[in-house]
Amino acid sequence: MIKTGSIFREWLPGWAIKAGLIFCILPAMLLLGLYNSNSTYTASYLGIEPEDMQFTMSLTYGTLIATMLIEQRFARFFAARNYLIGINLLTIVVLFASAFVKNMTMFVVLRMIDGFIMALPGGVMIQLLFTRFPSKFGRVIVYSFFYCVLLCSPAIINFLVGFTLDQWDWRYMIYGAIGVQIIGLAIIILLFNNKRLERKLPLYQVDFAGYIILVALLVAGTYVLVYGEKRYWLNAWDIRLGITIFIIFSGLFITRQKTSKRPLFNLDILKSANLRSGLLLFIILYIGRATLNVCHATMVQVWHWEQLYLAKIQWINAAGSATGVIIAATLLIRKFPVKYIFAASFGIMAIYLYWFRFLFKLEVGIGEIALPYYLQGLSVGLIFTPLIMFILAQAPSHLAIFGSRAGASTRFWATSLGFCLIHNAQVFLQRSHYISLSRNITATNPLAEERLSTLTATFISKGYSSGAAGQLAYKQLDASIRTQSFLLGNMEIFTWLAIVFIIFMILILLNKHLQQTYNLFRNRVFGY
C-alpha cells in the first residue's frame, strides 16, 4: 500500500499537489507521439522511409511495454523524489541528443531509450493520482483523464509540430519538449520531499534476463510485421531470421515465466476466457483505429491538404475522443450496463467506416468528412476506459497488476498488427485495381483514346513536342489510374471492416457474461 501522507511537502494544498502530478505525467504521454506526429518530415530529415518511422515508433512502444513489467521495482528502490528527478534528467539528455542525430542507427537506439524512460514514471504517478481522488469513483476519474490525454495527444502534438515547422525548424520542437521537462523537474522538486513511498527493494531481484528476452522478441516481431510485405515475406532472409528469433525467444520467455519465482508476467492471468475476450475486443478496436492513417494518407496524397491544415482538422477527431471518454465515465458512474457501451462503440465505428467509404473520391471538403471523422474519435473514446476496467475485472486481487500489463501488451501488438493488416490490404487491393484498370487503356477503348488525345493536346499547347507530349500524357493517365486504385482499395477496406464491426457489435449484445463480470469488478473497486 502506498503511503502518501509523508512524501509531499506538508505546506502544499491538495489542489496544488493534484495539478503538479497531472502536469508531470503529461510530458511522458505526449512524447510518445512526438516523432511519429510528422513521420514524413522526420523520415526526410533522417533520410529514411516511412516504414522505418513506423518501426522506430513500434520499438519505442515495445520497449515501453517491456519496461512496464519492471518499473515497479525501480520505483521501490529509489525515493520518489530522486526517482522522478532522475527520469526527467535522463529525458532531457535523450531529447537533446535527438535534436542533433541524423544517423538511423543512433536514432533507433535513442527511441528505445525513450521507451524505457517513458515507462518509468507512469505507474507511480497513476497510483499517486488514485490517492488524491479517494472517492469510490476515483479510478474512473483518473483512468478517464489518463486515456483522454492519450487519445488526444496526436492532435495536440500535430498542432504544436505544425506550428513549429511553419515558424521555425524541426529542432525547436525538441527544444520546446526540453523546456516542458525542465518545468516538470522544478515542480517535482517543489512537490516532493526525500521520504520513500514504500519499503526499499533491491534491484538484483529484477529478472533482467527475462526483460532482455522480451525486448528481443518484441523487436523481432515488430520487424516482421512492419517490413514483411516490403521484403516479400519469407523470400527475404531477414524476415525468416526475424520469425525464427521471435519463435525461439517467445518459447524462452514463456518457459522462464512459468519457472520463475518472480515472473515479469504471470501467464495464469490468461486463463480467464472473459479476459481473452476483452483483449480480442482491443485487437479489433485497434485494427479499426488504424484506418485513421488511411484517412490521413488520403488527405495528403489525394486531396493535397497541407500539414498545418491537417493538424487543425485533427482537433475534430480529438473532440470526439474527449466526448467519448466523458460520456463513458458518466455512464460508468451511473452504473450503465457495460456491454451496451461496448456495443455502442463498435456500432459507431461501423457507421464511421461505412460513411467514410463514400468519401474516397478526388475532391472532398472539410464539411463532408467532419462528422464521420468525429464519430471515429467518439467510438474509441467511448470504449477505452470501460474496456480497461473490464480487463482488470478478470484478475484476482493478487494478479491485478498483470491484468493491466496484459492490456498494455495487447495494445502494443494490436497497433503493429493493425498497421500490418491495413498496409498489406492497401498494397494488395491497390495492385489488383491498378491491373484491372490498366487493362482498359488500349487502342480499342474510345474513352481511353479520347482522354490520351486531350492530355496530349494540352501538353502540345504548352510547347512540348508531339513525342514528349504523348509520354507525359501516358504518365499523367497512369498517375490518375494509381490514384483511382488507391481510392477503390480504401473503399473495400472500409466496407469489409464495417461489416466486421457490425458482427462484433451483435456478438457483444448476445453475450450474457460481460455485464456479470463488470458487476463483480464494480463491487470490488467501487463497493456497490
Which stretches of residues belong to each language-model region?
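Interfacial helix-cap and linker-helix signal at transmembrane-aqueous boundaries
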Residues: 42-47, 74-75, 160-169, 225, ...
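MFS-fold secondary transporters
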Residues: 94-99, 114, 188, 355-363, ...
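Extracytoplasmic
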Residues: 12-71, 106, 121-122, 292-297
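Transmembrane-helix exit segments and adjacent C-terminal regions of multi-pass membrane proteins
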Residues: 2-10, 464-528
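12-transmembrane solute porter fold
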Residues: 14-31, 35-37, 264-430
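Helix-loop-helix hairpins in multi-pass membrane proteins, especially solute transporters
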Residues: 70-209
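Central cavity-lining transmembrane alpha-helices of secondary-active solute carriers
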Residues: 57-73, 122-127, 315-328
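Hydrophobic transmembrane-helix bundles of small-molecule transporters
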Residues: 166-280
